[in-house]
Regions:
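Extended, charge-enriched "interface" segments that sit outside catalytic cores
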Residues: 1-42, 46
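A donor-sugar binding/catalytic signature common to diverse glycosyltransferases
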Residues: 147-192
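Active-site proximal loops enriched in glycine and acidic residues that flank catalytic Cys/His/Asp
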Residues: 53, 60, 91-94, 130-132, ...
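Acidic/histidine-rich catalytic neighborhood
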Residues: 183-211
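C-terminal (or distal) subdomains of carbohydrate-active enzymes
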Residues: 207-222
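Long, K/E/R/D-enriched contiguous segments that form extended
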Residues: 33-139
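Conserved small/polar residues in nucleotide/adenosyl-binding loops
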Residues: 224-230
Length: 231
């Protein structure tokens, strides 16, 4: 990170910035080609690549990201929301052999992808991809191609991994909770370059101690009432 700070000297260098954008786009083209070869899904390299790749687990909250996709899909179908740029949402990760809920989450994400990607109304707006057999080698293709890194694990649950740092060092912005290495990353890149998400560990404990009802967070405006059962 100390070495990368030297790049701040180039922030007004248009020639450098153009080369940086070209390098990012080439990385996205490489990942787009890989996605098509492995899944048959065509994605636009110029779309925003919104990525969550990590072990599938409830506290890592891939299912929360998936529910957000449903809400965005419904907004787009109803014409109440338009992305400024097309968006490709990419998942990757493996589930432990005996972890039924994690395997169900993978099935859920693939089901959403089937619906979204087969809907002609979503052409040029939204694509959803689950990368099969995600591993370190595949990460070498994913990290350089990512625009937005999803680091939304439940605060207080995540060990201090390095995935968020790898994304950041390859030019991705981060949306994340104050958990694990996100805390250090936010200090390094500064608050204005980190999209803070969710509650802190102490706020979560307060909710649990006060026997909160999840129904109080279901908001008709955000379409969560259509993505979650209320009865």
């Amino acid at each position: 990170m100390d070495l990368l700070k030297k790049l701040e000297e180039k922030k007004d260098d248009n020639n450098f910035l153009q080369k940086f954008e070209e390098t990012k786009l080439n990385g996205k083209r490489k990942l787009s080609s890989f996605i098509h070869s492995k899944t048959g899904i065509l994605v636009d390299p110029s779309s925003l690549f919104d990525v969550q790749v990590k072990r599938i687990h409830q506290y890592k909250r891939q299912h929360l990201n998936a529910l957000q996709i449903i809400a965005q899909y419904l907004r787009l179908k109803n014409g109440t929301n338009k992305y400024e740029v097309p968006r490709t949402i990419i998942f990757g990760g493996k589930a432990a052999p005996g972890y039924f809920m994690a395997k169900l989450m993978i099935r859920f994400i693939n089901g959403i992808a089937d619906v979204v990607n087969s809907d002609p109304d979503m052409d040029g707006l939204l694509r959803v991809v689950f990368l099969p057999d995600y591993n370190v080698k595949l990460g070498e293709i994913v990290y350089p191609a990512t625009d937005l890194s999803e680091q939304i694990s439940t605060a207080g649950k995540e060990a201090s991994g390095t995935g968020d740092m790898k994304f950041a060092m390859n030019g991705a912005l981060t949306i994340g909770t104050l958990d694990g290495a996100n805390v250090e990353l936010r200090d390094l890149v500064k608050k204005e370059n980190f999209f803070l998400f969710g509650k802190t560990e102490s706020e979560i404990m307060d909710l649990k101690n006060n026997n909160y009802s999840p129904k109080t967070f279901i908001d008709p405006v955000s379409y969560t009432h259509l993505t979650l059962p209320t009865k």
